[in-house]
Design a protein with these regions (language model features):
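A short SAM/SAH-binding and catalytic strip from SAM-dependent methyltransferases
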Residues: 103-116
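Class I SAM-dependent methyltransferase core
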Residues: 38
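A short glycine-rich, Lys/Arg-flanked "PGG" loop and its adjoining helix->strand segment in the class I
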Residues: 119-131
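Class I (Rossmann-like) S-adenosyl-L-methionine-dependent methyltransferase catalytic domain
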Residues: 1-33, 43-93, 113-120, 134-169
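Structural signature of beta-strand start/N-cap positions in the alpha/beta core
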Residues: 35, 56, 100-102
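Residues that mark the start of a beta-strand
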Residues: 34-35, 130
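A short acidic, Gly/Pro-enriched loop at the edge of an enzyme's catalytic core
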Residues: 92-104
Length: 169
């Protein structure tokens, strides 16, 4: 798990820098004063690093089990006092008020959704971000490797629910 989180620890600063999300706003607000919504947090690979950058991180996922693991992961490797979670029960609606976040972020998540759900989540990302906020969403198209990667991903995710394997991961 530590090595898995370390990949997020190295990627998050790079993405935040590339997307201009590490600089103060025009009003001088720093990230530690802002709220980031992460769509598709999984077990918290990137969430840990986000909690070290932002004052509040709302980790959203379709899988309630992943949200539980995300809390555990951030408890070990991030700042859990900055973490909130939100269950995306229907797969496309964020249970968050409009204009409630400074940044919405999603990476390697939307390709796992149906096209309609991905578009609705993109609209939700815009809905929850404040005027002047930023939306950073990653869309990945299908690839030939998906024949192997998609079933392997399902298998790995299913092992998170097996206590002896899930705890080991």
């Amino acid at each position: 798990l530590e090595q898995f989180v370390a990949t997020g620890d190295s990627e998050v600063p790079a993405y935040l820098t590339v997307f201009g999300l590490r600089t103060p706003d025009a009003d001088g607000r720093l990230n530690e004063d802002k709220t980031l919504v992460e769509i598709g947090c999984g077990i918290g690979r990137m969430t840990c690093a986000f909690t070290c950058e932002y004052g509040t991180v709302v980790a959203c996922d379709l899988d309630a089990g992943f949200l539980e693991r995300c809390i555990e992961t951030v408890g070990q490797f991030g700042k859990v006092d900055r973490l909130r979670t939100s269950h995306v029960i229907d797969g496309h609606t964020l249970d968050l008020p409009p204009d409630s976040a400074d940044v919405t972020f999603s990476y390697i998540t939307l390709q796992h959704c149906t096209p309609d759900d991905a578009l609705e989540l993109a609209a939700e990302a815009v809905r929850v971000v404040r005027p002047g906020g930023k939306v950073a969403l990653n869309f990945r198209g299908p690839a030939t490797s998906d024949v192997v990667v998609v079933p392997a991903g399902r298998l790995v995710r299913s092992t998170f629910r097996i206590p002896t394997v899930g705890d080991w991961l």
